[in-house]
């Protein structure tokens, strides 16, 4: 899981790209869980939190851009 400080240094495009990758991983993890092939159940939680952190940063940036 990336730290928030590392995520803040990334550009909007990099964040969007990472978000897409995490959503793909989340889909694959859900599929593995449904078929009882999941080896690291904690990874689902990590991916979900990373997605939330990226979305939060994107919303913060959008709000600050709207104010400026």
Curated annotation (Swiss-Prot):
GO terms for biological process: translation. The keyword Ribonucleoprotein applies. One of its GO terms (molecular function) is structural constituent of ribosome. One of its GO terms (cellular component) is cytosolic large ribosomal subunit. Keywords: Ribonucleoprotein, Ribosomal protein. It holds the Pfam family Ribosomal_L29. Gene3D superfamilies: 1.10.287.310. Belongs to the universal ribosomal protein uL29 family. This is Large ribosomal subunit protein uL29. The gene is rpmC.
């Amino acid at each position: 899981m990336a730290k928030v400080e590392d995520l803040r240094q990334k550009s909007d495009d990099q964040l969007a790209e990472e978000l897409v990758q995490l959503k793909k991983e989340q889909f694959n993890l859900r599929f593995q869980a449904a078929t009882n092939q999941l080896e690291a159940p904690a990874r689902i939680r990590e991916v979900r939190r990373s997605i939330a952190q990226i979305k939060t940063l994107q919303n913060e940036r959008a709000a600050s851009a709207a104010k400026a």
